[in-house]
Amino acid sequence: MISMRAELAEEINGKIQILNQESDVKECKWYKLESAKNRFAIQKIIDLCLEYADIDRLRIDVLVWDSEDSRHKVIGRDDNKNLMNMYIQLLKNVIVKRWKGSGVWQIFPDQNSIIDWVHVRNILRKIDLYDDDSDSYLDRTWNQFKSLHSIVSVEEADSKLTGLCQAIDIFTGMSVFSFEKREAFTEWGKRKSPQQELFPTEKIELSNKDNEQSTVLNYCLEQMATKNINIRFENNSGLVTKDPNQVVNVWFYTPQTLSDKAPIRDNF
């Protein structure tokens, strides 16, 4: 989730559109990153976002989870509903904890037919007339700040026309890559290092996509370091943020209680 004051959105969207034109690409998406051309285009968007974040004009918050942890490793898991619940977790966390629960919010998610955004909006507004365990993600803190914020709209946006949707896709994809392909990134780092291993291990085969995505992840880490954004890569969990209040926050979700389980499909 990239969040900022409304008047900035049009400005940043316009700048990303210009950057893409200069790079001769129609759209930047993490999964499309397989060439130097796309890499350079994505790095320009990363630079732009970090430039605004560095002067506290936008936030970048990403939620990552392990589909094999105790919460998600359940029989009959409803992946669509689980994704929706995680969106709710992220929205609640950013609005209440990072923006202190204030403001009138317009939310523009990338088009995703899996998510019922009207339902998400209704849950966030607490106006659903039927039971839904997604509601459990809105805790006492959310209700405490309910009078201070208003969610006026949740409207899907076409990422081809909306640069900020491309930007959050890049940061989200990069964060997920850092966890799911952490062994590949570690192997890539070893190959780039001039130091020889004392105890060589079996090498992992790296695809062209692994190499390009690892290059961008490393580039982003270097750029954040120059701006004193304290995010690091850890071998067991990927990108890690120690201070969630800083302008770029990668939140690795862990089960909150023993009863914290992903939703199960109906009639399973």
Ranges and model annotations:
Residues 2-268:
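Phosphate-ester processing/binding pockets and catalytic centers
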